[in-house]
A protein has these predicted regions:
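Positively charged n-region of N-terminal signal peptides that target proteins for export
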Residues: 1-4
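Intrinsically disordered, low-complexity segments enriched in polar/charged small residues
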Residues: 7-8, 231
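Hydrophobic h-region of N-terminal signal peptides that target proteins for export
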Residues: 9-16
Length: 248
């Protein structure tokens, strides 16, 4: 019996060690995306003022993008895939510190600040942003394996027309708007606000979606640009390290 207890204790200790996360510091766990995926283009919206808040967001110290090592590795595969089709990836946001999410929450609570309404949420009253989950106190971005992005056409040297802008608050941003993302079938239709997207715009969204899903990412049902690594390494951890270039 004593030997059995000792064996059980040893096994428990081993399993406990096996559950220890591979990386122990932020700098070890994350990489600067352009170091891992050199072909990407960055337009970090929250470093500038052209975003739904209208200000630079807290925690964005440099116009760069960070991801966990695992997510960056998968994104490199996506990049290679779309390059073979004539595109590059363009990133709007990746890892987002908790202080940035807190900034969103404070902004959403200020009903008087509607500076950017006409550009990002013209059909919504700001008071519904919480109840409709456009703004939340926690974000998957803060776990470090989520990225917001689009496609850039290498032939035209322009963003691919997706029929809607990044961070548009409305049904027009949903992957199933005007089509079935599971089958890729375009169905047409109009939103409650009378908007629509063309078949080509829907198919452009599907090109991005397929490339991301083929290489280990999962989509969000309310944003065509938002993808999270399926096997994200820190599913319960919300980081607060600022966004800035990391040492290689």
């Amino acid at each position: 019996m004593k030997r059995l207890l000792l064996a059980a204790t040893a096994l428990a200790a081993f399993l406990g060690c096996a559950r220890v996360e591979k990386y122990t510091t932020f700098e070890d766990s994350f990489v600067t995306v352009t170091d891992a995926v050199p072909d990407v283009i960055l337009e970090i919206r929250y470093y500038g003022t052209y975003n739904f808040v209208g200000d630079r967001i807290d925690g964005y110290l440099q116009p760069t993008a960070l991801l966990t090592r695992e997510a960056a590795k998968a994104l490199k595969e996506v990049s290679d895939d779309v390059i073979s089709q004539g595109y590059r990836l363009k990133i709007y946001d990746a890892y987002r510190p908790q202080m940035g999410v807190d900034h969103f929450v404070r902004w959403a609570a200020d009903q008087k600040d509607v500076r950017m309404k006409e550009f990002f949420y013209p059909d919504l009253d700001k008071s519904v942003l919480f109840e409709q989950d456009y703004i939340m106190a926690k974000s998957g971005h803060t776990r470090g394996s989520t990225v917001d992005l689009t496609l850039f056409d290498m032939a035209t040297e322009k963003e691919v027309d997706m029929g809607g802008t990044f961070d548009w608050f409305g049904e027009e941003s949903h992957p199933d708007f005007c089509g079935n993302p599971e089958t890729g079938e375009y169905t047409g239709g109009v939103s409650a606000a009378g908007r629509s997207i063309t078949e080509q715009q829907f198919r452009n969204r599907m090109i991005l979606r397929k490339a991301m899903l083929d290489h280990g990412f999962k989509p969000l049902d309310s944003e065509w640009w938002h993808f999270t690594l399926k096997d994200e390494p820190y599913p319960e951890t919300y980081f607060n390290h600022p966004v800035k270039q990391l040492d290689k």
